[in-house]
Amino acid sequence: MEPQDRTKRPQEEDNGVPIDGHNGSNSEPAAKKIKLDSPSSADSRAKGVAPIKAEYLLFPPGQKAKPTQSEAEADDNDDDAAEGRTAPTPQETQQAPQKDGKRKSQRGQNKEREFGTFSDAQRLCNTIAWTPEFSPRPCKHGDRCNALHDLRKYLKEGRRPDITTFGGKCPVWEKYGKCPSGWRCLFVHSHMDEIKHEDGRSELVLVGDASKAPEGGEEAAGEIKPGVVNMVPVGIKYDLSKKRIPLEKSEQYLAWLAKDTKHLAKHYQKHKDDETNPNDYRAQYVEPPFKPSEKRRLYFGRETPVLAPLTTQGNLPFRRLCVELGAQVTYSEMALGLPLLQGLKADWTLMRAHESEIVPPRFNPGGPIVQGYDNSKDVKFGAQIAANAPWVAVKATEALSQLLPHLRLVDLNCGCPVDAVFKSGSGSALLDSHSKLERMIRGMNAVSGEVPITAKIRMGSRDGKLTAQKLVERLALGSEDLRDMIGAPGCAAVTLHGRTRLQRYTKAADWGYIAECAALIKQFNEKSNDLADTIREADENTLPNGGKMYFLGNGDCYSHVEYFDHVDNAKVDSVMIGRGALVKPWVFEEIEKGQYLDKSSSERLTYIEKFVRYGMEAWGSDELGLNYTRRFLLEFLSFFCRYVPIGLLERLPPNLNERPPAYRGRDDLETLFASKNYKDWIKISEMFLGPAPPGFKFQPKHKSNSYEIEAEG
């Protein structure tokens, strides 16, 4: 369902950029006059094609005016992959193998992506990586150590020369007065010195705080990134892997759950041939060993636009950029529950947040009264996990609640469409397992302490069988067997993506269905209160937010006009924005200001520079950190290139699912940003990160855009 007509909504002017075509002045250039035509004009646009003004088209209308099929396919596959590690294409699932192997190899997704190796030519020993030249720490390997201990040789032969971007000065050291990368920093000459001793010797030293070696060597250095919170020490992760971290609540709850599940199965097996009497089950029912703790109250409202959890692209630097531009709620990338319990570094790294994410979200005290909500204790950052069994979800939730001091909520992913996740029983596989999902939510709620539990779902696992309406009832009230015995499951909020698992991004999100679910949830919230009043006194521990379950919509939101249309007409509490933020991160700023913002190419370049700076702060300014930053910048640019400046459009609002014909920008930089050629993305990265090293590879999520740098010679 397309969003309703937005031309009737009151419009404001944007920084001299009128979004209704009228500002009382003719002094603005034509490119700055943004016009909204009548609905009939908007309907006349070619389906799926962005309406670029004729003067910016590279080809006359009708001649190569539409994006190619491979370009659209690449975009759609990248959109699927933003929710997971891989996703099948229609060709892979419906067609027989092609005889032309070469052509086949260039289609679909890169399911086993490689990014090459990018390390120093010779490794510097940790014992000298942060110390003065003459004062290394003792090396436990002694003469058997195969790393370099000669600092001067390392600086001359063991690594690349310093890069010259940012004036040759280390951005991390310039901001914080220290650089966790130490001698490995590729800007190290900006924070090192050579001092003369009385005996005539010259010693290389790091300047100021950069000379302080972290306890524990390289691993510890990775744990002290400036401005980063929710850092779990290496020792704790090791203890998790050895099952030395007590998860007592989980053990007690899971033991009860196993008995109850067995008892329930036996009851229904006994009565499978006749009508079951629920009173038989209730008579033998044993309550859980403990009640959930009372939860910290949540709040979602029209002033709290939400950044969706995004695999790969939803990394810390990108979230930090979006928060700076107005995002009020953020989520970690989806972490897998079992690797978290195994203490795997990669999944625990996803739980790190920037200090800007642990401040309270925006809250309008003049709005509706939210009983019990304390904005001063709220934070923006939440964690999202995927699990295929109650024991995984419950234990992972208790571990997160124990070990992460800054956590708004724990969200259970029930919508990931990726084959590998689905076949494991996680993600969107839970859309067809309502009973298991309820047990998971109840268990997570029981062990999470004061941290609320939420869920993200889709309309269903396949077209023609939409299950979200039944599922939201289950999440709001619980099954009929349990709702009047132990109350609601305790789900504080549900986010609904307006697509099924099998529906790809060629179709618009169904906001009509989202609106129907929003109306149901309003009824369920009222019914929950009625049940509490008529059956027994309300149990605050099973009624999140005092009985109100928040409902968020997700899908295709790309402007403030669409955002407020969904809040006002679909009646969702807030809107979660995913692809729209990847293409246009300042969509949150537009929502805050209530107007379109025609960002210039220089402003967009500033956002790229900020991403690079934030990447070096998060991952380091050494060879490894710079190329992590480069890799994730290229991932970001694979979406960023889709933005069509609104000054180039004939009509508004812009549509996220429309692809532009070939066009030129208002300047060379704007034209460069519009390129879908990976070589141009590399050029943009080199503006800030210097030339890519010989071992660097970049494989986008679609095979038609791969890059592998070749070593000279």
Curated annotation (Swiss-Prot):
Residues in coiled coil: none
**Cellular compartments annotated:** Cytoplasm; Nucleus
Active site as annotated:
C416
Tell me which cofactor or cofactors this protein depends on: FMN
**GO CC, any one term:** nucleus
Q: Spans of biased composition, class Acidic residues?
A: 72-81
Q: Which Pfam families match?
A: Dus
Principal EC category: oxidoreductase
Residues bound to FMN are P309, L310, T311, Q384, K456, H497, N554, G555, D556, G578, R579
Q: Which UniProt keywords apply?
A: Cytoplasm, Flavoprotein, FMN, Metal-binding, mRNA processing, NAD, NADP, Nucleus, Oxidoreductase, Repeat, tRNA processing, Zinc, Zinc-finger
**Disulfide pairs?**
none
Mention one GO molecular function: zinc ion binding
Query: How far does the signal peptide extend, from start to end residue?
Result: none
| Compositional bias of kind Basic and acidic residues | 1-12
| Entry similarity comment | Belongs to the Dus family. Dus3 subfamily.
Any idea what job this protein has? Catalyzes the synthesis of dihydrouridine, a modified base found in the D-loop of most tRNAs. Specifically modifies U47 in cytoplasmic tRNAs. Catalyzes the synthesis of dihydrouridine in some mRNAs, thereby affecting their translation.
Q: Supply the name of the protein.
A: tRNA-dihydrouridine(47) synthase [NAD(P)(+)]
**Annotated source species:** Chaetomium globosum (strain ATCC 6205 / CBS 148.51 / DSM 1962 / NBRC 6347 / NRRL 1970)
